[in-house]
Regions:
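Residue-level detector of conserved, function-critical positions
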Residues: 416-516
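Conserved segment of the helicase C-terminal RecA-like domain
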Residues: 336-362
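A short beta-strand element within the Helicase C-terminal
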Residues: 307-322, 346-349
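Conserved interdomain linker/interface between the two RecA-like ATPase lobes of SF2 helicase motors
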Residues: 176-249
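Conserved pre-motif I regulatory segment
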Residues: 14-45
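Conserved SF2 helicase motif VI
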Residues: 325-341
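Conserved helicase ATPase core of P-loop NTP-dependent helicases/translocases
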Residues: 271-274, 279-301
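Post-DEXD/H (motif II) to motif III coupling segment of the RecA-like Helicase ATP-binding lobe
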Residues: 135-190
Length: 516
């Protein structure tokens, strides 16, 4: 018998039965518990979990509990047909079938065309890959069904244009960092190789000037610059040198680019196929299954496998498409971080130098700031990322150092060693895994009261009670108290010093600098 308790939402009066779910991993159970607690106060919640950590399984478990003991309807909305099919399969494994009528899984395109034909009102609307939810088709759901509870699931709550999600979602729940998931064995470690900063390839990418409607690089210009035989030959040489005999995914800039890559790889003995939006759904499914069975070594795609592709035995990911979008970068590399029994680590081959503008996948991200629209999910200045110490000192062979095209940025052994030692500053992380200070101390904002608190990872260490958090250094924060005075507190909120009113406090090389 699973222990259960009843939540009564103060805000809505809706009764929700919550049960401990034994089939979930510990972090999924933690996220589920936190979600139901947030639903006591808020109607609309966004949940962030890294790619490969089981968002769809968590989604299914949440929906099953939401339906427990009550006559309720749940709509699950995705932005692509493939995601709909994947979610339907997972939901069915949790004992909920579409024939029952209580759960409907659909694409946003289908729902927009057929909303008038839908029976009844949904009690819960779940948005998969919720970073797309700012589109008007999704906003219509909020307007049409204001009383329905909302849940958004995403690995990347950020937008290239810096638009926040607070118009739709009341609060954000963040999971562990990628560093902690790797340290605890839930995500795969990785090796990371990249083109060199002064390479011809990097100079070509730096020459891209045109932008598309979404603010990212223009596809037409990327194709003209990068879809050349010399460039495709370099892509192949990178795979031959660093991922020979492995199964992998390649991200291309265009349909023509993908087909040229697949043809060149196949011609040179690496069985590859190109998949894009023009590939019929039935054929696409067969090709993916052939890849799972090992009959195809490489899938070259254009925007198809950035989200929702679930194949844990992907052994390498090749980035052949430049992007200014943090979400695209993390979604793509995340395809290789899923764990499988036979995979020691994943090889990430960065042929477009993305780590220089986004950092490594293990870098700490301020999801709260991006969720609120205070920070864009875009590329940072290259000089800032290069000087941020995003690699560690590894003992490399002379052959590696002489590598003509690529340099080794990180090895999986160096990464695991850094995580074990808690030496995460060099990785852009926040602190030792598994300890009290495993992630950086950060400010957290309560939009209802307007006050600020402190959190370490997922744990709120100081409830919102400050008018401002000026600066943070290690386990100390410079704050403005509710009475207007300023001071320094530790990570538990204990005042270390209090000063008279001033305009700003900040830390400078460990010392406090007061600006009046």
């Amino acid at each position: 018998m699973r222990p259960s308790f009843l939540l009564l939402s103060v805000a809505t009066g809706i009764r929700i039965m919550y049960c401990k779910d034994d089939c979930l991993r510990d972090y999924q159970q933690e996220m589920k518990t936190r979600l139901f607690e947030e639903w006591e106060l808020h109607r609309s919640v966004m949940v962030q979990m890294p790619t490969g950590t089981g968002k769809t399984h968590l989604l299914a478990a949440i929906v099953r509990e939401f339906l427990c003991g009550s006559d309720t309807r749940v709509w699950i909305v995705a932005h692509r047909r493939e995601l709909v099919e994947q979610i339907e399969e997972t939901v069915a494994r949790y004992g909920m079938r579409k024939e029952d009528g209580s759960v409907k899984v659909m694409s946003i395109q289908w729902l927009s065309r057929n909303r008038k034909a839908m029976d009844g009102q949904p009690d819960l609307i779940v948005i998969d890959e919720a970073h797309h939810a700012l589109a008007e088709t999704y906003r219509e759901l909020w307007k049409k069904y204001p009383e329905a509870r909302k849940l958004g699931m995403t690995a990347t709550p950020c937008r290239l244009n810096r638009k926040g999600f607070t118009d739709l979602f009341d609060t954000l729940i963040t999971s562990w960092s990628i560093v902690e998931f790797i340290g605890r064995g839930w995500l795969s470690s990785f090796d990371y190789v990249s083109i060199r900063a002064n390479s011809k390839e990097q100079r070509l990418i730096d020459s891209l000037k045109k932008r598309g409607a979404d603010g990212d690089y223009q596809v037409k210009e990327m194709n003209a610059v990068l879809n050349r035989e010399t460039g495709i030959r370099r892509l192949y040489e990178s795979v031959r040198r660093h991922a020979a005999g492995k199964k992998g995914i390649v991200y291309a800039v265009s349909i023509a680019h993908a087909r040229q890559i697949a043809a060149y790889y196949s011609l040179h003995g690496v069985k590859s196929v190109a998949i894009d939006s023009k590939t019929p759904a039935s054929e696409r499914g067969k090709l993916v299954e052939a890849f799972r069975q090992g009959e195809i070594s490489v899938l070259v795609n254009v925007g198809i496998f950035s989200e929702g592709f679930d194949c844990p035995d992907v052994e390498f990911v090749q980035l052949a498409r430049p992007t200014l979008s943090l979400a695209k970068y993390l979604q793509q590399v995340g395809r290789g971080l899923r764990k499988s029994d036979d995979k020691e680590s994943c090889m990430l081959i960065d042929n477009v130098g993305l780590h220089r503008i986004f950092g490594l996948p293990v870098c700490d991200r301020d999801w709260e700031a991006m969720f609120e629209g205070r920070m864009a999910g875009n590329a940072q200045l290259r000089t800032r990322m290069e000087n941020n110490g995003l690699s560690v000192s590894c003992s490399l062979s002379e052959d590696s150092k002489r590598n003509e095209g690529l340099e080794i940025v990180m090895t999986h052994n160096c990464l695991l060693d850094a995580i074990r030692k808690g030496d995460l500053i060099c990785l852009g992380g926040g602190g030792p895994v598994g300890g009290e200070q495993r992630t950086a101390l950060k400010a957290c904002h309560d939009r209802q009261s307007g006050l600020w608190g402190l959190r370490c990872g997922n744990k709120i260490t100081v409830i919102p009670q400050y008018r401002e958090v000026f600066d943070i250094c290690a386990n100390r924060a410079a704050v403005r108290f509710e009475d207007g005075r300023t001071g320094v507190v530790d990570d538990s909120g204990t005042p270390l010093m209090v000063t008279d009113r001033c305009r700003r406090l900040r830390f400078l090389k460990g010392e406090l600098l007061s600006v009046t």
